[in-house]
Amino acid sequence: MNYLNELKKLEILHVDNYQYIESKKLNKDEYLLHQGEKLNYIYILLRGKVKVNHINANGNSMLCSFNSPYSIIGDLEFITQSPIINNVIAYEDCICATISLSKYHEILMNDVFFMKAIAKNLASKLSKSTQNQSISLNYP
């Protein structure tokens, strides 16, 4: 998998932990994560774009974001060990790196490189969310 070299350059994981990565292909409109289910894998988007949406209690779908390559998917649920908060759907054909949480959760929790990548990813999401919210509030 030539994506491993790209991930290694980004230092998303400690060098010893790349051996746990597998790859997953998604076709356009295929679900990667379903809201309310248990998170079984952590994902790193390698190619393509995914759409993140949330179904409200009244049944309305709210678009949250689009994620591009090298974003980590499932980061919040990984940290909080909570059910999946949003649906994640392939907006186009995608390739993801996957790591099984049932096998490697503790290893990832103790990987300083991975936790740093998670922190950066969450900070980016918070920044985008804040910008989007301020635009919505200021829109006439």
Predicted regions and their residues:
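Cyclic nucleotide-binding regulatory module and flanking cytosolic helices
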Residues: 1-28, 71-73, 77-79, 110
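Cyclic nucleotide-binding regulatory domains
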Residues: 30-92
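A generic structural signal for short hydrophobic patches within well-formed alpha-helices
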Residues: 104-105
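Polybasic "coupling" helices that flank or enter modular domains
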Residues: 109, 113-140
